[in-house]
């Protein structure tokens, strides 16, 4: 239970930073994140028509997952129009793209992230978009962020496949992460996850491999999104044949 001084301080921040979706702050030596619904303008009103609903869904999801002991940030304080999260360290993306960290440490971090996602699925829970920028690592502790993009599908096999594809796609998006590194991560994940989940993902990629070949002529001019798709198919499917 947070004290009255903390609550009052947060309310002042909400008033002062009401147009900021995410605002970091320090209180008594600890770092927190204040999160509010997005304030959208222009085309984004069409692309994301229900920011308040998405915000409430994320808060509800965080609270429910915390009850199930899932690795999510602690919600320190919340109301209908904001919530405060305790800081949970750097993202996996930040760790892996840090040139001052050796590869052995990077493998340790990404392997921890793999096991955390596998464990989440073993509990019949899904994230919805477990990109490495939405996963943090701090001294061996893995935490999942940003549950706003969770799928409404009731097909458990599909939502697990979706999680796995988002995870590997996010690795493929990073220029600083080599194909060899991702191949080792894929082998580690395959070794430790349920065989059925890995096979389901491979079957999905095989079924949609035509997309890879359809997009292949554009490879010389491809940008980040397309490059990630090429790498995803090549690392997990094409080059393993």
Regions inferred by a protein language model and the residue ranges of each:
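ATP-binding glycine-rich loop module of kinase domains
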Residues: 12-13, 18-56
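Conserved structural core of kinase catalytic domains
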Residues: 38, 54, 72-110
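Structural motif at the C-terminus of the N-lobe alphaC helix and the adjacent alphaC-beta4 loop
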Residues: 56-70
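Conserved hydrophobic alpha-helix
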Residues: 65, 113-120
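Catalytic-loop of the protein kinase fold
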Residues: 122-132
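Conserved protein kinase catalytic/activation segment
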Residues: 134-146
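C-lobe/activation-segment region of protein kinase-like
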Residues: 143, 147-241
């Amino acid at each position: 239970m947070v004290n009255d001084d903390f609550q009052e301080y947060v309310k002042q921040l909400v008033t002062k930073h009401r147009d900021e979706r995410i605002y970091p702050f320090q209180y008594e030596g600890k770092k927190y994140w204040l999160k509010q619904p997005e304030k959208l303008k222009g085309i984004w009103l069409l692309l994301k028509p229900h920011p308040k609903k998405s915000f409430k869904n994320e808060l509800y999801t965080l609270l429910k997952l915390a009850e199930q002991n899932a690795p999510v940030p602690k919600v320190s304080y919340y109301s209908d129009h904001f919530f405060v999260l305790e800081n949970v360290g750097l993202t996996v993306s930040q760790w892996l793209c840090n040139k001052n960290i050796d590869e052995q440490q990077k493998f340790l971090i990404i392997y921890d992230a793999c096991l955390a996602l596998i464990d989440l699925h073993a509990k019949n829970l899904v994230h919805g978009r477990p990109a490495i920028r939405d996963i943090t690592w701090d001294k061996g502790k893995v935490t999942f962020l940003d549950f706003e993009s969770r799928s409404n599908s009731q097909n458990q096999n599909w939502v697990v496949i979706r999680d796995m594809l988002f995870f590997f796609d996010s690795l493929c998006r990073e220029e600083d992460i080599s194909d060899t590194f991702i191949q080792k991560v894929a082998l580690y994940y395959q070794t430790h996850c349920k065989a059925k989940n890995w096979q389901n993902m491979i079957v999905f990629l095989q079924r949609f491999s035509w997309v890879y070949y359809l997009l292949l002529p554009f490879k010389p001019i491809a940008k980040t999104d397309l490059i990630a798709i090429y790498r995803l198919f090549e690392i997990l499917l094409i080059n393993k044949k």
